[in-house]
Amino acid sequence: SKDEGEKPFWISFADLMTALMTLFLVVMAVSLMVVTKKINEATQAEKERSSEILDICMSIKDDPTLKNQLITVDCKENRINFGEAGRFGHNDYRLNAEGIKALSALVPVVLEAANSENGKKWFKQIVIEGFTDTDGSYLYNLNLSLRRSEWVMCSLLDPTFNPELTLTDEQKNQIKQLFLAGGVSFNAAKDSKEASRRVELRMQFYGLKEKESAEAQPIFVSAPIEKCQLAR
């Protein structure tokens, strides 16, 4: 009939817009779900990372070997403090016998933690930080703090510094890769000058995707006998 012939064949513009809006909302909802899922996965991964790093630090802190030492392990800041044992005399970069003894007890514990399942996954390096008081110029204190850090490294690798610390060649190579000597001058002074003249160890850990893009660690060949270059 005439009426049937005049019925519109195409859908109305309003119906078309409604369909497009519905499709747009569906696409947006799916996209939002995907983004939310990725955020939740990243959040969960970061929680797991933080938990595993805490386990690494606590394994060092709770090790019975360190029970009678003056060492303080701060698992919130990931720092290791030697207290009185890690202090230096004025204008002196030589770690005292008590500090070397504490270091001897600590290093095998740290290496064991670094070689654990979580340690291999997250442990990046340990920065040996030497500090000074505020006496003298900046460059003077920078040099002094560097020598204090280097003295700690000498205590780990030069057998004449610390006969009590017996390490295998593999452990010595791991120390060269894991430990980093760095000076900090007087940027973090304590309440007293005596407390400021100290050495601390700062543990650093990989980020979630950092290790995947990290460059390969250099391979160090152990010398028959490592010899410290600092004057004793």
Features from the language model and the residues they span:
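Charged linear interaction tracts used for macromolecular binding and regulation
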Residues: 50, 57-58, 77-80, 101
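Periplasmic OmpA-like peptidoglycan-binding domain that tethers envelope proteins to the cell wall
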Residues: 93, 97, 127-210
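Short edge beta-strands and adjacent turn/loop segments
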Residues: 68-81, 122-124
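Acidic/histidine-rich, surface-exposed loop or edge segments in extracytoplasmic proteins
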Residues: 78-92
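Periplasmic peptidoglycan-binding/anchoring modules of Gram-negative envelope and division proteins
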Residues: 60, 64, 88, 92-127, ...
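Short terminal targeting/anchoring segments
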Residues: 1-65
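Well-ordered, non-membrane alpha-helical segments in soluble/globular domains
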Residues: 50-54, 103-108, 149-154
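Short, cationic low-complexity segments
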Residues: 213-232
